[in-house]
Amino acid sequence: MNKKKILIGTDTVSGIAPQILKAISLASNENSLPYGEDIYTKKCRNIVRKIFEKQDLEIIPMMSGTASNSLALSSFLRSYGNVLCHSESHINKDEGGAPEFFSGGGKLLSISNSIGKLTSKEVNEKLDELNFKGKQNSKICGISITQLA
């Protein structure tokens, strides 16, 4: 019996679905305006605006999860700031320092526990600890809630 190996660690280790490859191939034969003015980005933007019922909503299509996460974090994380996250979170373990690089030196400040997810109690304790230390502390700019329990 032949068994096919399945890699589930990330979507970047496998090929793409035939339907996606066909759509990309067809689109590559067209001439389009750049910088979000192509018909595909416009269609996507309109769909997202309809879903969120917000006509001035903007989207930025990205090519990878690391780019997406780094851009999102760098939009509010400054060189003097921190983002709280779990020590086992994807942004802390798998982004290779990209969020810190693209934010100009902002820092991911991790919290560890045995369940692999942040709890509101731990977040509040960390915020209290940082507030107690005073003004020389880096500012908390955000909390990664992807691993919130």
Put a short name on every predicted segment.
Residues 10, 56-59, 143-148:
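Structured catalytic cores of enzymes that bind and process phosphorylated ligands/cofactors
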Residues 103-148:
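PLP-dependent aminotransferase-class I/II
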Residues 51-54, 76, 91, 100-103, ...:
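Solvent-exposed alpha-helices and their adjacent loops that cap or buttress functional pockets
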Residues 56-77, 111-113:
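Conserved core of the PLP fold type I
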Residues 75-93:
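Conserved PLP-anchoring active-site segment centered on the Schiff-base-forming lysine
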Residues 1-23:
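N-terminal amphipathic/basic leader segments beginning at the initiator methionine
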Residues 17-65, 87-88, 93, 98:
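Conserved N-terminal alpha-helix of the aminotransferase class I/II PLP-enzyme fold
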